């Protein structure tokens, strides 16, 4: 739905496990006025390996989204950011806060330096959303199992332009039952705002 709200009309969905259920639910996309085609993995290819199943005549960058991501991010803005920065790969990242339930002690050797009681840390985490140029997809070998972090690291070694897009909108990984339940609870409120 958010892809459609961002103006995206053409979709490729990679399927393997429970493929028929997914295909039966989404069909050809006509009930949403979009075009959906399926990339059927005979063997699991990973989050990046399946990109090799895309048509070879892609002319522009694409958005790649992990299937367990729910977000209000504007995908057209990601593509514009990707293009404006002449990136080969754009990784969407989300700030994630962690809190320690304990006081953290810093030492040098055996010498005490400091103590911070129950500190909070913040770091950027992979949001499972990417913008990718066709030249990156062309580097993937057919039938190669490859996940996106591996593809990104390979392209970093090749000195490709890899940038990060900060996701500030609602985002949640719904790959675990507890986070799916949380999303069920939050989504109606998020979509009303």
Language-model features, listed with the residues they occupy:
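Active-site phosphate/pyrophosphate- and oxyanion-stabilizing loops and adjacent acidic/basic residues
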Residues: 1, 20, 52, 76, ...
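N-terminal glycine-rich phosphate-binding loop and ensuing alpha1 helix
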Residues: 1-20, 34
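Short, surface-exposed alpha-helical segments at coil->helix boundaries
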Residues: 19-23, 149
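Conserved beta-loop-beta/alpha segment of the NTase-like Rossmann-fold superfamily
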Residues: 23, 29-109, 132
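Catalytic-core segments of class I nucleotidyltransferases/pyrophosphorylases
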Residues: 63, 70, 76-83, 96-99, ...
């Amino acid at each position: 739905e958010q892809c459609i709200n961002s103006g995206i009309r053409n979709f490729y969905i990679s399927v393997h496990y429970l493929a028929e259920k997914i295909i039966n639910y989404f069909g050809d996309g006509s009930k949403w006025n979009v075009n959906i085609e399926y990339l059927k993995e005979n063997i699991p290819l990973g989050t990046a390996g399946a990109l090799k199943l895309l048509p070879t005549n892609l002319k522009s960058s694409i958005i790649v989204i992990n299937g367990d991501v729910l977000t209000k991010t504007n995908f057209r803005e990601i593509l514009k950011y990707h293009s404006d920065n002449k990136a080969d790969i754009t990784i969407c990242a989300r700030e994630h806060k962690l809190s320690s339930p304990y006081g953290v002690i810093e030492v040098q050797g055996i010498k005490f330096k400091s103590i911070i009681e129950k500190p909070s840390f913040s770091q950027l985490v992979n949001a499972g959303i990417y913008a990718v140029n066709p030249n990156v997809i062309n580097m993937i070998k057919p039938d190669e199992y490859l996940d996106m972090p591996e593809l990104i690291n390979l392209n970093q070694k090749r000195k490709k332009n890899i940038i990060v897009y900060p996701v500030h909108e609602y985002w949640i990984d719904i790959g675990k039952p507890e986070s799916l339940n949380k999303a069920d609870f939050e989504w109606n409120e998020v979509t009303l705002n």
